[in-house]
């Protein structure tokens, strides 16, 4: 069964086409890499999946729900790690997860959630003293509250050193082993090839290829990164909080 289905999706902002005729299927339990340079339409696609913006044309189904009709049901079963989201310096790691649980109105063991992302020993520390990698993992722990069926990760390795990026990939693999579907957006192929079953590439808002990372790497001459923007990125509202579906906001395109 498909976890994500997009059929002929196009999104225009006045005279700018952010996404053009995108058709894509992600199976349940799959780790899908969504690649493209900044401004390629990745963040707009994520916003469409979460019904933060409506497509100009096309249909979108997530976890069996039509996003236009059942967006709340989609967000209740989806955990989001948005690009650029930061933590509250004066709150402990445990308090962040407790707040996430309260916002989602679910029962959750904060220490168990932090254990899943390797932060059990830092649960009582204020997040202001966390490293960049620890902050990213804390936001992921918040996204995991409620055991979502789908994880959407928007540039989860952005700003991380190699060790931090490796830790993030290991967590993604661990969640995939639990049966979670993962939609992993990035502009660097090497960040997703170790964890993803398939990879889709976006260029200038259009789908360029969907295949295994092995075939895509061979076809691209072993290039590891997709860094050159085809056009300036679109800027939308600030990134969404991973806490409460009814208070989330659209994902912001990377500057």
Where are these regions (language model features)?
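ABC transporter nucleotide-binding domains
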Residues: 2-6, 11-203, 207-209
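Intrinsically disordered, low-complexity cationic segments
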Residues: 64, 186, 214, 234-235
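Residues that form or immediately flank small-molecule/cofactor binding pockets and catalytic motifs
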Residues: 67, 212, 250
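Short, surface-exposed loop and linker segments with low hydrophobicity and enrichment for Pro/Ser/Thr
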Residues: 89-91, 133, 217-220, 255
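Short, flexible cytosolic linker that couples an ABC transmembrane/permease module to its adjacent nucleotide-binding
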Residues: 112, 213-216
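Short, charged/small-residue-rich alpha-helical element at the C-terminal edge
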Residues: 215, 221-255
């Amino acid at each position: 069964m498909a976890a994500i289905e997009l059929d002929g999706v196009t999104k225009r902002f006045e005279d700018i086409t952010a996404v053009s005729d995108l058709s894509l299927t992600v199976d349940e339990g799959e780790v899908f890499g969504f690649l493209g340079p900044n401004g390629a339409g990745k963040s707009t696609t994520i916003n469409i999946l979460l019904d933060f913006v409506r497509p100009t044309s096309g249909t979108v189904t997530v976890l069996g729900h039509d996003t236009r009709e059942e967006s709340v049901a989609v967000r209740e079963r989806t955990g989001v790690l948005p690009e650029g989201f930061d933590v509250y310096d004066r709150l402990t790691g445990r308090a962040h997860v407790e707040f996430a649980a309260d916002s989602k109105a679910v029962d959750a063991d904060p220490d168990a959630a932090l254990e899943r992302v390797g932060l059990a020993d830092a649960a009582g520390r204020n997040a202001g003293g966390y490293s960049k990698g620890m902050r990213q993992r804390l936001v992921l722990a918040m996204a995991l509250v409620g055991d979502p069926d789908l994880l959407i990760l928007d540039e989860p390795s952005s700003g991380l050193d190699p060790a931090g990026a490796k830790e993030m990939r290991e967590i993604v693999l661990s969640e995939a082993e639990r049966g979670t579907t993962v939609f992993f957006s990035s502009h660097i192929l090497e960040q997703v090839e170790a964890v993803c079953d398939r990879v889709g590439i976006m260029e200038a808002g259009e789908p360029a290829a969907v295949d295994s990372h092995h075939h895509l790497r061979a076809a691209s001459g072993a290039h590891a990164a997709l860094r050159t923007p085809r056009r300036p990125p679109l800027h939308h509202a600030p990134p969404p909080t991973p806490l409460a579906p009814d208070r989330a906001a659209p994902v912001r395109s990377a500057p």
